[in-house]
Amino acid sequence: MKQYLALALAALLLVGTLASCVQADPNAIDDYTPDIDYMVDEAGNTFYFEETEGEGAILVKYVGKSTKDDRVKIPARFVVESQGIDRTVVGIGASAFYGKASIVAVEIPATVTSIGTQAFAGCTNLTSITFPNGMLSVGSQAFANCDKLATVSFGQSLESVGDHAFWHCTALTAVTFPETLKTIGEGAFYHCTALASVNFPAGLESVGTLAFCNCLSLPEGVEDTIPATAKKGDFLFVIDEELLTTEAVTDPAEEPAE
């Protein structure tokens, strides 16, 4: 059993390691393409946006004025009157808030439908998050290492939770998925040690390998509540302290995504 688990861990974490090797620093504005512009809100916070096809925009970077207790309100529209820009904010891009330890709260507008890779990874003082009802997907490692994140409201339309999305969210106590959820990625809630309650909607189609591995507070028999029709990865709820504290287990969110 341990040999198979070790192999699964190695394969899963190798993917994250390889991805990290090619990721750029989101703090380097020079990496951004020329079609990115910014707006400043009334509080003096700067939001950088990338225009999408149609009339949409994706938030790709945030620079806040506050150095602590920062409460972010993401605008629903990207407006630069001097340039004639007025677009709907439809997504939060990769690493947009990566490592922003000053952030304690984020308000996401109803217009947003997706959260990108590592968008809030390492926001170590973020305590709760509420997704709008139109949210469809949460990207890989989106909230990895948000170790004070205690509550998450998933809205009513969510379809997918990406790989390692809530990796090491050790304060998270309960997860209630909407009936629309289809997929839970690999290691999505890995080492959420306080997680004591989770529901699986009837329409769930797949749960990835190690999705709830080392969730020490989950009750026995929780795996039996996954719909019989759902495809299940290996070692979903395995708890093995000796194996999981070896050097082979590395953090998939150590480097910011591009």
Describe the function of each predicted region.
Residues 42-44, 67-91, 101-114, 124-137, ...:
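Structural signature of tandem-repeat unit edges
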Residues 1-10:
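Positively charged n-region of N-terminal signal peptides that target proteins for export
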Residues 59-64, 71-72, 95-97:
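Short, surface-exposed, low-complexity cationic segments
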Residues 37-64:
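GGW-centered surface loops in extracellular recognition modules
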Residues 94-96, 116-119, 139-142, 162-167, ...:
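Consensus positions within tandem repeat domains that build extended binding/scaffold surfaces
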Residues 9, 13-17:
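Hydrophobic core
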Residues 17-32:
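Sec-dependent signal peptide cleavage junction
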Residues 27-28, 52-56, 64-66, 80-87:
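Intrinsically disordered, low-complexity coil segments
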